[in-house]
């Protein structure tokens, strides 16, 4: 079973100076996270209901840390055309207008599409955050029920317990690596944080200086 967080992550983050070095360390960590999940699925013969083209989970609130948001921001700036980037920024503005007036609880009881969802697919799949990579289902019908009844927060999750537990521990371990090195450990909502990252270059400098990265984004209280 591969180690997670990868043994190199603390050193990668500690020695990073440029955005590219920070993002490189996180990319390697995300690859290790995927390897960990795939190994568990293979070893335990977990039968996932997830399939290409299904986007029911892309209407859920997505919690992220600032380092994940900055990787996504770098990715869209580098990979999207000017037209695609402008369209994304417009969708992020609409998304923020919907989400910012809501409490996190109000948000999770509504279906609000991720602004990064395009034609039923994730437009930043290669750099999607840990919480999206952790999410999985054993039962499509359970996902459909959650989508159809967003206010029913008592419906049992259709996760594989061992897989979800292990990936949650790994996700928290990665976040703790950044926190121990003095970086912002606030839990943000993805769309509102990405909107600010793209709109406000100083957010990167604040984060790099150990301050709170995003001042307007929706925040999820720590458990």
Descriptions of predicted regions:
Residues 1-223:
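Short loop/turn segments that flank or connect secondary-structure elements
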């Amino acid at each position: 079973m591969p180690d997670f967080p990868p043994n190199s992550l603390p050193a990668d983050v500690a020695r990073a100076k440029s955005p590219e070095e920070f993002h490189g360390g996180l990319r390697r960590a995300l690859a290790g996270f995927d390897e960990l999940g795939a190994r568990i699925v293979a070893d335990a013969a977990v039968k996932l209901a997830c399939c290409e083209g299904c986007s029911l989970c892309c209407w859920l609130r997505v919690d992220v840390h600032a380092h994940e948001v900055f990787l996504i921001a770098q990715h869209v700036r580098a990979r999207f055309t000017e037209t695609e980037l402008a369209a994304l920024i417009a969708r992020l503005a609409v998304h923020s207008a919907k989400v910012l007036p809501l409490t996190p609880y109000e948000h999770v009881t509504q279906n609000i599409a991720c602004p990064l969802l395009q034609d039923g697919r994730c437009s930043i799949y290669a750099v999607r955050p840990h919480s999206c990579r952790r999410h999985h289902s054993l039962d499509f019908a359970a996902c459909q029920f959650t989508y159809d009844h967003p206010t029913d927060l008592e419906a049992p999750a259709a996760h594989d317990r061992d897989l979800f537990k292990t990936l949650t521990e790994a996700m928290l371990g990665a976040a703790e690596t950044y926190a121990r090195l003095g970086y912002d450990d606030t839990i943000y909502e993805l769309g509102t944080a990405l909107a600010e990252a793209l709109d406000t270059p100083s957010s990167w400098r604040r984060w790099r200086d150990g301050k709170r990265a995003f001042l307007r984004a929706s925040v999820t209280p720590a458990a």
